């Protein structure tokens, strides 16, 4: 299995969503290898398929004043927050590689971070298999997961709190869970972490867990791939 990894740095949510949709079409047509987008978003709130507006705790007017947009999206899950200091990942993967088993795919996503946190930082993280998706440390969520699958190709993905401003989660009831908190790598270690270093580690552990040979490609490389494939399809 080959895996393209593209770190896009800071990207507006709607731009990232549009990019996912373009890549999804190419992956469905088998004109693109499995691709993992890693990036950050400016502060934004998204509502998944099971989400409720009542889990956003501040008014639309206040959000507008703060410049925080809200998007209703097709991923699984409830309400979540994205913002600077958080690694957001969008795997555009063919589920045929995991036997078209969605639960297995989510399990593997969780495994990436459980292994990364233990091996690289000595943090004992775990999954809550009986109730909730995601990766947890001491009862608090450090990685949120919510995917969508169309034609057996994945979209959306995960949000890993690295140096995230956790106060922003007070704007919402994260994932609709009133009795659970959130944490970050910075909070657990007691200091900020070199962000780009963690980005590389995420890619490395994706390669390990999914048995993939990964390579980093630039934003320009990705745009060129899309351009060439689109031009070919129009001929």
Curated annotation (Swiss-Prot):
Pathway it works in: Protein modification; protein lipoylation via endogenous pathway; protein N(6)-(lipoyl)lysine from octanoyl-[acyl-carrier-protein]: step 1/2
Residues that, per the record, bind substrate: 75-82, 144-146, 157-159
Enzyme class: transferase
Subcellular locations according to the entry: Cytoplasm
Entry annotation: catalytic residues: 175
Broad class of where this protein is predominantly found: cytoplasm
Limits of the BPL/LPL catalytic domain: 30-214
GO cellular component, one term: cytoplasm
EC number: 2.3.1.181
Described purpose of this protein according to its UniProt entry: Catalyzes the transfer of endogenously produced octanoic acid from octanoyl-acyl-carrier-protein onto the lipoyl domains of lipoate-dependent enzymes. Lipoyl-ACP can also act as a substrate although octanoyl-ACP is likely to be the physiological substrate.
Protein name: Octanoyltransferase
Organism: Caldicellulosiruptor saccharolyticus (strain ATCC 43494 / DSM 8903 / Tp8T 6331)
Gene giving rise to this polypeptide: lipB
């Amino acid at each position: 299995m080959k895996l393209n990894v593209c770190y896009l740095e800071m990207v507006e949510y709607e731009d990232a969503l549009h990019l996912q949709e373009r890549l999804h079409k190419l992956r469905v047509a088998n004109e693109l290898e499995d691709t993992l987008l890693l990036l950050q978003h400016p502060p934004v709130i998204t509502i998944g398929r099971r989400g409720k507006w009542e889990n956003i705790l501040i008014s639309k007017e206040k959000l507008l004043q703060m410049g925080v947009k809200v998007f209703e999206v097709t991923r699984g899950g409830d309400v979540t927050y994205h913002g600077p200091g958080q690694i957001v990942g969008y795997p555009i993967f063919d589920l045929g590689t995991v036997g078209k088993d969605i639960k297995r795919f989510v399990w593997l996503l969780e495994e990436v971070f459980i292994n990364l946190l233990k091996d690289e930082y000595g943090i004992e993280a775990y999954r809550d298999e009986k109730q909730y998706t995601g990766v947890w440390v001491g009862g608090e969520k450090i990685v949120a997961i919510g995917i969508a699958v169309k034609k057996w190709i994945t979209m959306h993905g995960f949000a890993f709190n690295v140096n995230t401003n956790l106060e922003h989660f007070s704007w919402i009831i994260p994932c609709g869970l009133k009795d659970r908190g959130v944490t970050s790598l910075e909070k657990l270690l007691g200091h900020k972490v070199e962000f780009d270093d963690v980005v590389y580690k995420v890619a490395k552990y994706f390669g390990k867990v999914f048995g993939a040979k990964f390579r980093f490609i630039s934003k320009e490389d990705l745009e060129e791939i899309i351009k060439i494939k689109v031009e070919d399809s129009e001929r």
